[in-house]
Structure formats: structure tokens, C-alpha cells
Amino acid sequence: MSKLTDLTMAEARDGLAKGAFTAVELTDAHIKATEAQRHLNAFIVETPDLALEAAKASDARRQAGTAGSMDGLPIGIKDLFCTEGVQTTAASHILEGFKPPYESTVSGKLKAAGAISLGKLNLDEFAMGSSNQTSYFGAVENPWKKTSDPKAKLVPGGSSGGSAAAVAARMVLGATGTDTGGSIRQPAAFCGITGIKPTYGRCSRFGIVAFASSLDQAGPMARTVRDCAIMLGAMAGHDPKDSTSVNMAVPDFERALTGDIRGLKVGIPKEYRPDGLSDEVAKVWDRGIEWLKAAGATPVEISLPHTKYALATYYIIAPAECSSNLARYDGLRYGLRVPGKTLDDMYKKSRAAGFGAEVRRRILIGTYVLSAGYYDAYYAKAQKVRRLIAEDFRKAFETVDVILTPTAPSAAFGMGEGTDDPVTMWLNDVFTIPTSMAGLPGLSLPAGLSADGLPLGLQLIGRPFDEETVFRVAGVMETAANFTAKPEGV
């Protein structure tokens, strides 16, 4: 039998149902894998004792015939989701030691389905970053290595870098992520796993530490398309505590994996071949198009003309919302407090000490674009361009069923690269941001390896609330890609 940590979530679920092993055995195997790979720094908080208690309760439910849809499956929770009684930091000094008195809706739904949390996963501070190097608790290391330089440490992508690294390194069967401009899809591509940002409003944002409220969306990260479908089924659903949560039935995403995509039209946007796109990524994209043709789908060239404005638009809207959301961290009620001579002095000192450089940068940008003299020139104009970007997608989906693009312009890069050049770092999300601006579902799956042995991902974009078609096409591509590689030593 395979090592328990090599099982996919679906395989582990079936094994538990057949009695091949217990939830305690499965959980213990993943706890040991987590302990053996602490050098990756994927977790901020590990909760092995709580996990084993939950596993015992899971085995009891199974014995009683009341097991949930994810009962006994070990997962990790990105440390942006509030977890009752367990430290939640958003990877920031300003929230160090904060233990929420309530549970986020998404983590609560997973717990109700029987999933077992092994702890809180590392991320870029307040989810602001594309490389997981901005965390107050240290950078996360990608478990993959370059064949040409095995000693070089690589980034896992961000902001959900801890989630991606933990899944790729077989510490957990799946993990929650959040995606504001690519924070599920880009790290999934860098770490050779699958991740989906659902349609905005599919999953509740209640209890998720806010970055940009009109963009943030929770989603699953796992090793296969089926595993993501299983997780999203448990995570999604209407929540009256979140006014942006959409009141519609949650489909059986797993049933969408029919393997039949004959007759579907797949959009190939011509604007997604910019200067600087690596030849390897372009070749993987072309290969993906051929896989879909072979399965009976028809590729159709489409135009998304406002794509070129998406990055600039995002870096006006997201910082504007971030500057507003992060105004609540004042050192008064919870988190870090640095004493000052006056109340204003205490605010300034607490925020200066509590926020990292990237977070301060985005707060400053946001405050600037919202200021009286610049609001119309920047923020109001950006919102108009955002509408045009969404309209491009709406028109495209009149003629195609899904859109296929690369996920990231390159494979994972080395730690320390680009940290002194924020614009270069922001360009990592050039293919994922337009989808976020339009609120559409986007899934990344591993499609091949670079010449240096690093994973390369492809992105599928769907119509609003049509994650089922995205999953259906992704399942076919996953079979064609037959991506079985894993990090060495895992």
C-alpha cells in the first residue's frame, strides 16, 4: 500500500470508508511529515494534540455511521482564517498572539464536514505578496529544487505559499487559501499542485482577515482536481453573516468530473502572449491547447483588449481597499501595542512596528489614491477600467465556454530575487489579476516541468458560478498531463 501521506484526498476518503486505516493513523502520518519538514516553514502554528483529538472523534463518528463528507481528512488552514481559540496572525507582528473568540465560516464548514486541521499555515503578511517572503514569521521555502542548482532555495509563490508548500510536501491532503489577485493560483503553479479561486461570493468571507474586500475569495488547494472539488463542496455556500455571499445552491462539484468535453469551445486570449513570456511557459500552453483538441474541444482565439490595464488597475483598487481595511489596527483592543506619549503617538508607533514594509507600501499607495486631490484621477478611473475588463470577459463568454491561459509567466524563482523591486514582483500576477478583477472562477493545475525540473501551471477561467465546467475541463487536462512528479525527498 502507498504511504498514507502519498494518498490523494479522494483515495484517503475511500480508504477510511473501507476501514483500510483509521483517522488517527492518517492524521499521525501527516503530523510526522509536518515535523520532518519544519525547515520549509510552512506552518506558523501546529496543533497536533487538537488534531489527534479530532481524529479520535472522527473515528467514533465513522463507527456510529455519522461521518461527514471530509471526515478524518487532515488539512491545513491558511493563517488568514480566524480559528476559535487558536492563534490567528495574518503573518503580521501586529496580530501576534491574537486568539479569535469565533470561527471563520469556511473553516467552520470544513470542521463540520469532519476535516481535521493540523494548524495554521504561513503566508505573505496580510496576504500581500507573490512569494511568501513578507511574513513576519519568516519566508516559506518551496519543496521543489532546480536540477541545475539543488541547493538554491526557491519561493513557493504567494500569498498562500504555506498552503501550497504544505500540500506539495505531503504534510496535508489539502489546504485553504485565499485569492485576491492570484494568491491561490500562482503558488499552486509554483508548487506543482491544483488550486481554484471560486467565483466571488461562492465562499463566505466572514472571519477571513480582510485585504481587499471586493476581491478576496477563499478557495481550496490540493494535489488533484477531484480533491479541490471535494474541498470546495464543503467550503462553499451562502452565509447571512457575509453580505457578498451569494444565496444559491452548491453543486456537487465532484460529479462534474465526467471526462467528456466534446463540443466545448475554449478561448485562447491573444493578449496573454506578452514580451517576456518564457518559451517554456508558451510551449506548455500550446501543449494544453493540443490536449483539449484531442479530447474534442475547439480552441477559439479571443481578444481581451483591456488586459494590459489590469495590473495597474489592481494596484490602485486593492491598496485603496487595504488602506481602509487596515485602519482598524490601532493597538487598542488586540494585537501589538507600543506605548506612546499621546494616543496619536501610540497609534503611529504601534502601526510602524506592527506592519512590514510591503504592507506599509500598499497602505501608503491606497491612502494616496483615495485622497481628495487624486480620487477621481486614480481610484474612480480604475473602477471604470475594472468594469471594462469584466465586460471583455462577458463578451468572450458569449462565444466560448472556458478560457485557457498560463498561470504565471515563469517557474518558481529564487528567494531574495525581486525583493528590492516591487513592480517586478507584482508582475508575477499578470495572468491571474484580470480574472480576479472580473470576479470569475479560475483554476490552476500542473501541466509540466521546466528544463530545470520545476512545475509549470496552466489556468482555466470560467463563467460566473460555472465552476462545474472549469472542473470538467480541468479533469480532462489533468488526465492528459499525467503530472506525477513530486519534490525530491518527499
UniProtKB/Swiss-Prot annotation:
Active-site residue list: 78 (charge relay system), 159 (charge relay system), 183 (acyl-ester intermediate)
Hydrolase found in the keyword field: no
Keywords, ordered alphabetically: ATP-binding, Ligase, Nucleotide-binding, Protein biosynthesis
GO molecular function list: ATP binding; glutaminyl-tRNA synthase (glutamine-hydrolyzing) activity
Domain of life of the organism encoding this protein: Bacteria
EC number(s) on file: 6.3.5.7
GO CC annotation: glutamyl-tRNA(Gln) amidotransferase complex
Biological process according to GO: translation
Pfam families in alphabetical order: Amidase
Catalytic activity: L-glutamyl-tRNA(Gln) + L-glutamine + ATP + H2O = L-glutaminyl-tRNA(Gln) + L-glutamate + ADP + phosphate + H(+)
SUPFAM superfamilies in the record: Amidase signature (AS) enzymes
Homology family: Belongs to the amidase family. GatA subfamily.
Biological role: Allows the formation of correctly charged Gln-tRNA(Gln) through the transamidation of misacylated Glu-tRNA(Gln) in organisms which lack glutaminyl-tRNA synthetase. The reaction takes place in the presence of glutamine and ATP through an activated gamma-phospho-Glu-tRNA(Gln).
Self-association state and partner proteins as the record states: Heterotrimer of A, B and C subunits.
HAMAP family for this protein: GatA (MF_00120)
Protein's name in the database: Glutamyl-tRNA(Gln) amidotransferase subunit A
Organism: Paramagnetospirillum magneticum (strain ATCC 700264 / AMB-1)
